[in-house]
Every structure is written in structure tokens, then in C-alpha cells.
């Protein structure tokens, strides 16, 4: 086995593509004939010509009476023409009647036109009594008749090679009597996730283990690109198991995708295993990009193997850039669907120095309907970063920042960009999740995008018109009042309203039984207390800092000096649940959060204060239907009862749902 190379050469994306194409030229893989019921989304391999006329006979396009047009000339409302009804023709039967001068036959839509007739008069312009028919409107020859071959004639091209089959094209194939169609074969793809920490979804999860995300994500991406997954597996980080899975993939598939085991850390085996198969082996090992540095490409027995990074967002980003185009080409799918869109940066963006960065972003609409790119703040290992991101911005290595409102191109993760009905940017709260659950029971298709950036970020998002509403709980140090004083401070007095939400009990989340005997914020200064803070700009963080300021005044010192004594003050997280989880698993002794989170995790709670969690809403969005539905739900007795039941520590009031400014 060859000696392992640890990212010997980091390639640019362009150089990596060039090297890949020198050894692997994606091309269609041949054709296969399949039944129409299996053909949706497939690509036609050959031109299809009509073997029959469509329709195969002259047929009525309306319910009415088949007649000779000349018999109706001169007919009008006051002077109807009278003819004799000599029979009827139903859909699907061969007409047995022949129409002579002065005669008509009743006919159904789609039925064959009887001999002698050259028009159909609509039933609305007739009056039938016994065998006599009065006609109140003249028709022209051919009127209300679909002539044989008028849709498709024998030998005419019905569909052309390379067309992707949608329900419309399948209808055409059915109309010309084809039960099967020749299509390009889908590339077969093996998807392998690697890591000792991985457990298949549905399995038992123990501490230190995580569910395998990547194989599900990548398998779905393969299907959207036009491929089919022939093997989906989880491999342990052992040479034997990983090698076995790769060999199975090479046997069953045209292309192999792995994720994980690509970095230069101990226990990562993929590079060595792939290089052990012989020449050419590993061709790319490391990209000068973020995320995606540990990407691998190899050619094994004439088949391409892509080693994607282990983090979900990194894996999908590199898949989009390198793998999707290859699979689409192999499936003979033309990129007619737009996978890039234009947007503007919602805020100033700082980039990684010296490395090209693919920055995941949310896409939201501002007041004018223009798209704004809002960077996800979690790392590439966070599943929320992946689930909420619509695509990514390509930032060159020589660019250190993008300015607010700077124009950018966003590469979409999927061609199916679904705009959100409701955009909520602000402070995280479990009660808001319960409120959205309540709405979705009656509006299951509601698309809501929630971006947790804290109360300060929520006020800024509303000020810039980026969100419909924001959850906020900012305490004004001077007045002791929540949220209302900040309308003036952010210039929102005339633009937005505060809708009363509910009271939240804030305090210190501690282990069951409170083994460290923590009684209040002052105890955080103890040497034996490990702490985790909330993110800057969040109402909870501001609440802590105000408490430290009061203590600093009492002790005749500064808040900064007190903060420096707290073990973990600089360690931040974005949610109350994250604080509770850290306490549960013994990572910290205490963190400031809401009682609801402590109850959910079976932990103890040391009350500090009660605060108001309200909704900040742009006035012009109050008439937006999803906002109206949200406010109706907020005011309902059903929601208030559910909030009390599901979220102890969140307390609605008589003012809940009222505009208070």
C-alpha cells in the first residue's frame, strides 16, 4: 500500500475540474425501453414519429347534432331551420347512420362524424322535439369538428430525442398508442457514508454517535440530477469494511460517491484504499476552497470515485459543483432548469482569507420582491445550516468581504427554489415553534423560514424590510421596559408594531438536583462553575450583561472584569435547547435560558427574572395572509392552552395578540 499523502497539493476548483476531465469524460450510457408508467422524468433516446393519425377519424368537439352545414344557412333566432333527427352517435362507436339533406344525428363530444355530415351544431343553439330539430344558428363546414390527423399525422414527429418526459409528453405517447418508450439509461450510483460515529436513521443512538445524514442527502441529490442509487450503505472507519463497501459499489454502479474519511486525520483511510487499486488511482486530493478542502477524486477500474467531505453542507456543496454536472450529462439531461439566481447581500460578509469560499445562504425577499442572500451562521457541520440554506455564494480567495447590498450570484442547491410564505428573523423561542405547529394544522402547505439571529438582529431585519416579523425580548436598561423603547431607537415607530406575545421565565439551567448549589448570576463568578453564553445581540445575552453591570456597580468594578472571571463567557450558542443539552451531558454547570428548556430536558431551574417575548411586525405586512393567520392563531384560546401544556414557563396573558404601540 502506498504512503499516504496529506493534502500534498491543494488545487483550485478549475484545476481540479481539468484534471478530472483528463481521466473521466461523462457521456450518456446507452438506452433502454421502459413502460410509460415508469418513464416520468426520463430522457427520450430516439425521435418518436406517430404511427397513426391523431385523431384517427373526424370527431365531434362539442355535444350537439351532426349535420350538413348548408342545411343551416340562414338560420337565426327568429327564423329557425327545421331538420329531421334520424339517429344518434355515441362516443366509441362506428356510426351506422348516414346524413342526407334535411337530416341530423344527435352526437356526443368525441364521437365519430357520420357519413354525409360536415359540421356539428352545438346543442345550445337547437331545440329537439320528437323527430324534429329546430336550429337557431348557422354553422360553417368543418365547424365543431376535429379532422382526422389534425393533431398528428402518420409519420409526423411526435417527440424528439433529448426531450425530458413530463406528464404532457407521456400523454402524447399514449395518444399514438405506445406502451413503451426508449429512454437514456440512468447512471447507477453507489452512495457510501463513512465514519465510526454514524448510525443509520431509525437505529439506536448512544452518546457520541450521530445519525447518518449524508447518504440520505446525497441519494436524494443523485435522483434530482437524473441518477439512480444502486447501493446506499454506511461503512465503519476500518480498512476492511470501507474497502468492502467500495468494492461493492464499483461492482454495482457506474459512479461511486463516498462522504467522510477524506481528511488528513488519524483513522481516515479513503485515500490509501483508493490509491491501492493501482493507476491512475487518486487524481485529486484537496481543494483550495472552503468548505470542501478534503475532496478526493479517483479513477478505479475505469470508474469514477468522488470522496466528498463529511460535513453535510460541505458534501452537498462539492456535489453541486463537481458531481451533479457529471451525473446529469451521463443521464443525458440538459441543464434547462435554472440553478443560479441573482441576489444582494443582506449584510456585510467577511470571508476566509486566502481560500476561495462557498458561503451557504438563505434567500429571502425584501419589500420590493428582490432576493436577499442571508448567510447561515452555523458551520458546515450543522444540519440547520443545510436545511435552511437555499444555495451558496462563490467568494474568490482575494476577496475578504462583501458589502451590504452588494450584488452576488447564488448557486442553488436545487432547481426547486420554493419562496417562503413567512420569513421570521429574530430571537429563538420554543413558543414560536408551537405557534407555527398550530398554524400548520389548518395550513399544512405553509412555508416558513426562521433565522435565529437574536433580538437585535430581529430589529435590524425588520428595519431593513427583510422579514415579515421578528421574535424580540430586548430589555431597556433605563426604563426597565421590554421592546417598546427600541422602536424609536431603530427608527421603527411609524413602520412597525409590537404585538404582545407572552411572559417567559428566564433563569439559570442547572443539573438535576442543582449539585453545585447555584442560586443566582453571582455564582457564575465561582471558579468551579463552567458556563455557556448566548450569542451577542440575543435578549438573553443582554439580560445577563445587565445583571453583570448591576453586580459590577455593587462591587465597584467593571462588567468586563466580572465577565472575564466567568468560565465560558466567550463560548456562545444560539438556542435555549443547546444550553440545556450542554448541561444535561455535563459539558457545563449552568447557562442562562428559559424554564421551558430546563423542563424539556429534565433539569433544574433557578429563576432570575420574567421577561416579555413579543412579535415585531412591519405594518405593511399585517395584511399579508400568512401573517394574519399567525396573529389569529396567537390570539386563540386553543394556542394559549397548548402553550401552557407544552411549554411550562411560557405564560400567555389577556394582552397576548394585541398591538401595544
Regions found by a protein language model. Give the residues of each.
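N-terminal segment of the mature folded domain
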Residues: 441-523
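Short, low-complexity N-terminal leaders and the immediately following helix N-cap/first helix
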Residues: 1-79, 106, 121, 324, ...
Amino acid at each position: 500500500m502506498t504512503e499516504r499523502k496529506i493534502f500534498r497539493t491543494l488545487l483550485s476548483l478549475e484545476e481540479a475540474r481539468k484534471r478530472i476531465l483528463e481521466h473521466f469524460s461523462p457521456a450518456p450510457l446507452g438506452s433502454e425501453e421502459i413502460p410509460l408508467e415508469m418513464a416520468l422524468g426520463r430522457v427520450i433516446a430516439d425521435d418518436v414519429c406517430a404511427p397513426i393519425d391523431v385523431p384517427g377519424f373526424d370527431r365531434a368537439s362539442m355535444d350537439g347534432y351532426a349535420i350538413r352545414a348548408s342545411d343551416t344557412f340562414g338560420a337565426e333566432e327568429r327564423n329557425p331551420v327545421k331538420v329531421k333527427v334520424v339517429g344518434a352517435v355515441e362516443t366509441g362507436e362506428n356510426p351506422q347512420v348516414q346524413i342526407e339533406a334535411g337530416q341530423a344525428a344527435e352526437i356526443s363530444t368525441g364521437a365519430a362524424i357520420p357519413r354525409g355530415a360536415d359540421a356539428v351544431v352545438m346543442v345550445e343553439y337547437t331545440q329537439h322535439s320528437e323527430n324534429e330539430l329546430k336550429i337557431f344558428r348557422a354553422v360553417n363546414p368543418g365547424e365543431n369538428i376535429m379532422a382526422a390527423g389534425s393533431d398528428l399525422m402518420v409519420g409526423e414527429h411526435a417527440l424528439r430525442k433529448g426531450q425530458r418526459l413530463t406528464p404532457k409528453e407521456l400523454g402524447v405517447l399514449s395518444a399514438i398508442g405506445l406502451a413503451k418508450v426508449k429512454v437514456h439509461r440512468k447512471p447507477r450510483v453507489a452512495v457510501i457514508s463513512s465514519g465510526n460515529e454514524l448510525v443509520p436513521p431509525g437505529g439506536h443512538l448512544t452518546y457520541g454517535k450521530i445519525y447518518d445524514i449524508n447518504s440520505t442527502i446525497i441519494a436524494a441529490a443523485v435522483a434530482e440530477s437524473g441518477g439512480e442509487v444502486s447501493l446506499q450503505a454506511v461503512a465503519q472507519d476500518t480498512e476492511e469494511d470501507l474497502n468492502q463497501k467500495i468494492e461493492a459499489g464499483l461492482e454495482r454502479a457506474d459512479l461511486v460517491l463516498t462522504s467522510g474519511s477524506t481528511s488528513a486525520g488519524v483513522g481516515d483511510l479513503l485515500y490509501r484504499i483508493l490509491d491501492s487499486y493501482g493507476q491512475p488511482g487518486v487524481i485529486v486530493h484537496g481543494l483550495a476552497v472552503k468548505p470542501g478542502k478534503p475532496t478526493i477524486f479517483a479513477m478505479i477500474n475505469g470508474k469514477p470515485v468522488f470522496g466528498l467531505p463529511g460535513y453535510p453542507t460541505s458534501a452537498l456543496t462539492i456535489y453541486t459543483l463537481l458531481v451533479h454536472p457529471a451525473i446529469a450529462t451521463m443521464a443525458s439531461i440538459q441543464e434547462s432548469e435554472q440553478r443560479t439566481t441573482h441576489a444582494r447581500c443582506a449584510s456585510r460578509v467577511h470571508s476566509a482569507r486566502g481560500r476561495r469560499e462557498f458561503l451557504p445562504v438563505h434567500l429571502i425577499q425584501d419589500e420590493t420582491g428582490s432576493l436577499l442572500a442571508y448567510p447561515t451562521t452555523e458551520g458546515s457541520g450543522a444540519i440547520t445550516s443545510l436545511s435552511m440554506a437555499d444555495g451558496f455564494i462563490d467568494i474568490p480567495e482575494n476577496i475578504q468581504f462583501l458589502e451590504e447590498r452588494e450584488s452576488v450570484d447564488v448557486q442553488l442547491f436545487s432547481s426547486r427554489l420554493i419562496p417562503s410564505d413567512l420569513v421570521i428573523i429574530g430571537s429563538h423561542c420554543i413558543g414560536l415553534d408551537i405557534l407555527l405547529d398550530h398554524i400548520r394544522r389548518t395550513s399544512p402547505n405553509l412555508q416558513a423560514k426562521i433565522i435565529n439571529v437574536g433580538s437585535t438582529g430581529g430589529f435590524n431585519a425588520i428595519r431593513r424590510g427583510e422579514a415579515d416579523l421578528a421574535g424580540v425580548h430586548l430589555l431597556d436598561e433605563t426604563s426597565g421596559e421590554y421592546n417598546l423603547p427600541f422602536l424609536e431607537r431603530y427608527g421603527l415607530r411609524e413602520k412597525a408594531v409590537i404585538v404582545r406575545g407572552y411572559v417567559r421565565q428566564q433563569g439559570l439551567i442547572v443539573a438535576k438536583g442543582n449539585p453545585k448549589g447555584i442560586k443566582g448570576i453571582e455564582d457564575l463568578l465561582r471558579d468551579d462553575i463552567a458556563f455557556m453564553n448566548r450569542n451577542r445581540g440575543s435578549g438573553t445575552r443582554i439580560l445577563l450583561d445587565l445583571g453583570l453591570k448591576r453586580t459590577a456597580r455593587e462591587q465597584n468594578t467593571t462588567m468586563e472584569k466580572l465577565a472575564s472571571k466567568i468560565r465560558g463567557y466567550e463560548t456562545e450558542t444560539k438556542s435555549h435547547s443547546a444550553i440545556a443539552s450542554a448541561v444535561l451531558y455535563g459539558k457545563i454547570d449552568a447557562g442562562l435560558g428559559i424554564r421551558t428548556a430546563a423542563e424539556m430536558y429534565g433539569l433544574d431551574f433557578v429563576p432570575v427574572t420574567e421577561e416579555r417575548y413579543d412579535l415585531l411586525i412591519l405594518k405593511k405586512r399585517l395584511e399579508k395572509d400568512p401573517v394574519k393567520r399567525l396573529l389569529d392563531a396567537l390570539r386563540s384560546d386553543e394556542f394559549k392552552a397548548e402553550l401552557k401544556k407544552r411549554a411550562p414557563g411560557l405564560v400567555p396573558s389577556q394582552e397576548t395578540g394585541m398591538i401595544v404601540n
